[in-house]
């Protein structure tokens, strides 16, 4: 779009900050919502995208006053919206583990979409799930949720992660140091992951 020095109320804009608390859309997980507030105006952020060179593009509409280049601003993430996304993302980890337990270790994640109010999880399998298999998967996920299992994140070498049995996304390229997410005291679920998650398995009350 067109580069502008200032934007007034009602204008849709994209803002780049020198640093940000916002999570950008990546890995199938949607970006944060929130507010960016300056001395002379504010904007509602409804999408965040990350460019190839690592810049975070905060997309939204000016809701009051005017925002200008070089303004000093405060960036505030919508905490409830972020919590809902984290809950959904954590649930995908539980779902993948349950699917592999019920159907077999051949099951691999083929894609996903994680939003604040729903998830889509694509996986490899040679047949549609039976009603019995579906019920087993559902029960296993619900049991993990009700257990309130701890969610533990660790950074380690890719070799150490593989030794611990961490699941990796097929076709994904990883660096020498990776983030490993384990759910449960005994690492019942263990995956490489860069998304935002809860500190315990998702509660129906979250």
Residue ranges of predicted features:
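A glycine- and charged-residue-rich anion-binding loop/surface
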Residues: 1-201, 205
């Amino acid at each position: 779009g067109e580069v502008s020095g200032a934007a007034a109320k009602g204008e849709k804009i994209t803002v780049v900050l020198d640093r940000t608390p916002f999570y950008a859309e990546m890995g199938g997980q949607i970006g944060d919502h929130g507010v960016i507030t300056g001395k002379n105006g504010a904007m509602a952020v409804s999408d965040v995208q990350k460019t190839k060179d690592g810049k975070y593009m905060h997309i939204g509409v000016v809701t009051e006053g005017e925002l200008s280049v070089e303004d000093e601003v405060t960036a505030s993430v919508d905490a409830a919206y972020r919590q809902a996304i984290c809950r959904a993302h954590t649930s995908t980890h539980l779902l993948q583990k349950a699917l592999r337990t019920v159907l077999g270790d051949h099951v691999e994640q083929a894609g996903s979409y994680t939003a604040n109010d729903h998830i889509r999880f694509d996986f490899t399998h040679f047949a549609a799930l039976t009603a019995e298999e579906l019920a087993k998967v559902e029960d296993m996920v619900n049991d993990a949720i009700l257990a309130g299992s701890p969610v533990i994140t660790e950074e380690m070498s890719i070799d150490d992660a593989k030794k611990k049995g961490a699941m990796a996304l097929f076709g994904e390229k990883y660096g020498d140091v990776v983030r490993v997410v384990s759910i449960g005291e005994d690492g019942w679920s263990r995956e490489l992951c860069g998304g935002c998650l809860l500190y315990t398995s998702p509660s129906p009350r979250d």
